[in-house]
Amino acid sequence: MALLQISEPGLSAAPHQRRLAAGIDLGTTNSLVATVRSGQAETLPDHEGRHLLPSVVHYQQQGHTVGYAARDNAAQDTANTISSVKRMMGRSLADIQSRYPHLPYRFQASENGLPMIETAAGLLNPVRVSADILKALAARASESLSGELDGVVITVPAYFDDAQRQGTKDAARLAGLHVLRLLNEPTAAAIAYGLDSGKEGVIAVYDLGGGTFDISILRLSCGVFEVLATGGDSALGGDDFDHLLADYIREQAGIADRSDNRVQRELLDAAIAAKIALSDADTVRVNVAGWQGEITREQFNDLIAALVKRTLLACRRALKDADVDPQEVLEVVMVGGSTRVPLVRERVGEFFGRTPLTAIDPDKVVAIGAAIQADILVGNKPDSEMLLLDVIPLSLGLETMGGLVEKVIPRNTTIPVARAQDFTTFKDGQTAMSIHVMQGERELAQDCRSLARFALRGIPALPAGGAHIRVTFQVDADGLLSVTAMEKSTGIEASIQVKPSYGLTDSEIASMIKDSMSFAEQDVKARMLAEQKVEAARVLESLTGALTADAALLSAAERQCIDDAAAHLNAVAQGDDVDAIEQAIKNVDKQTQEFAARRMDQSVRRALKGHSVDEV
C-alpha cells in the first residue's frame, strides 16, 4: 500500500470525462493563463490575440479594470492604478515601505500591521488586488474553454516564504478558484521542457523579467525537483535595458528637457521598439521627437553589458550557495521576455558552458509548465500516468540526541517533495552517526513510528559540532521515501529507501494525528526538558575536554568554582526542572567565560608563532 490510496483533489469519477484545468503564471509585470488541449499545452490569448495580461489593476468608485486598459491609466491616475502587487504579497507594511520607499500609493496599516492601499474603491490589500488579476485570467480561460475551471496550478517564486504562498492561495480562493497546487516557477519552466522525466542532475533556471532577475539552481532526482539555491536582483530587469537605451537616444537626439512626459513616453516607446528589433537585426532606424538616426546591436550591447554581468554575478553566488560548479549544470532554462536579447543568451551560454534552452517562448514557459501539471492533477491523465498520492499523511523526520524527533517534512506536504536539513556531531572525535528515520506527529521518538535505521561512517574526527552532515529526505510520486546523509567536507554518504506508511491503515494514521493533538501540551513540555538535558550533557562534555587539555590556565580557586558549577549542573540535569537546568547551564557559562578567553588567546599565540605580521 502506498502512503494513501486516494485520488487527487476533485478527481473525476468518470475517467473518460475531461475536466477543465489551467496553469497560471501570476507575474510581477505580466501574467498568463495556459491549458492543455489535444495533448498540447498552450497559453490563452484575449480577444485581440494578446497572450500577456499586464499585472495592473485600475480602481474607480464604480468598479475596476485589469490589464492593458488599467496600465493606460498609470500616468494619469497613479494612486488608483496598482502594479507590481506581487512584491507586496505576504509582507508587512513596514517591510514594504523599507524595501520599496518610492511606491506612489497611499498606505494604511491594518490591525495586524499588514498593508492596506487607499483607492477610489476603498481600502484594498494585496490579496484583493491579486484576486482581481486572477479573476481576469480565469474569465479568459473559462470563455476560451467554454466552461468553469475545475482547478488551477499557480506558480510562485522559489524563494516565496509561507506567508507569501498563503497570500497567493487566499487570493485564488477570493477569486473563486480551486488551487490544485502552488508550483515553484523554476520547476514549472523545467517541466515545460520535459526535464522532469529526463536525465537526473542539476538544472539552472535563468529568469530575467521586466522588473526583476531570479536565478534558481535545482537538482532533479527520482522525479523530484529540489531547490538547492536561489538568488537574483529584485531591482534589475529588462525595463533597465529600455531606460538605458532611451537615455542614449535622448543624448544622440540632443533632447535636454526631461520634464515633458509626452517626450519621455515617446523616447521609452522608441527604445522598447529598438530593443525588440535588435534581437533579429544588426541595425535599426529610430525616428523620435524630430530626430532620425541608427542604432546598432553593438552599441546596444555596450549599454547593457554591465547589467548582464550583474546577473552572472548573481548566478555565481547561487552556484556557490548550492555548492555546484558551472560545468556540473546539465541544462540552463531561459525564462522571461528579456532573455530574447542576444547578448544575454550569449553571455549565459559562455558562463555555463552550454547552449541555453530557448525553444519555448520565454514569456510563456512558466505558464505552460503549470498547465501541464494542472492537467495531471485535475485527473485528465490515463490511470497508468495518474498520481495516486497527493500529500504526506504523517510527518517524516529524524531522532536526535535526547530521544527527540526533528521533523524534516511536515504532514500534508504535497508530493513529490525533497527537503534537506543540516546536523552535526555531539562528541569530540565522533566518526560515525546513526540515522534513525521516524514517522509521526509526537515530539519524542518513543511516541513515533520507526521506519528505518542506517549509519554514516567515515566522518572526519573533529571537535563536537565541527562536522556538518546534510540529511536529505525525498518522497517521489509513488510515496517512496529516500533518505541520504552526506558529510559535506568529504562527500561521503549513505542512504536508504522505505515506503513510509507501509502497513498503516487510514484509521491508524488518524489515530496518530489525534494523539498528537491530545498530548500536544504534554509533548512540548517533554521536548523542552529533553532539549535542556541534551544541552547540559553537551556543555559538560565540552567542559571536561577543555579542563583535560588546559587546566594549567586556571588557579586552584578558579578550578574549584568551575568544578562546583559543573557538579551542580550534573545534579539538576538528572531531575525534571527545566528552569533549574537552564539556570545551571547559564551559571557554568558565567564561571567559564574567563577560562574560554584564555584558551582562545593561547590558541591565537600558537597559530601566530613563527609568522610575521605581514604574513598574517
Swiss-Prot record:
PROSITE patterns the UniProt entry points to: HSP70_1, HSP70_2, HSP70_3
The record's section on Pfam families has:
HSP70
- Look up the record and give one Gene Ontology term from the biological process aspect: iron-sulfur cluster assembly
Q: Name one GO molecular function term.
A: unfolded protein binding
Keywords in UniProt for this one?
A: ATP-binding, Chaperone, Nucleotide-binding
What job does the chain carry out?
Chaperone involved in the maturation of iron-sulfur cluster-containing proteins. Has a low intrinsic ATPase activity which is markedly stimulated by HscB. Involved in the maturation of IscU.
Q: Which PANTHER family match?
A: HEAT SHOCK PROTEIN 70KDA
**Protein family (similarity comment):** Belongs to the heat shock protein 70 family.
By its UniProt entry, which NCBIfam families does this protein fall under? HscA, PRK05183.1
**Protein name from the UniProt record:** Chaperone protein HscA
Source organism per entry reads Salmonella arizonae (strain ATCC BAA-731 / CDC346-86 / RSK2980)
The gene it comes from is: hscA
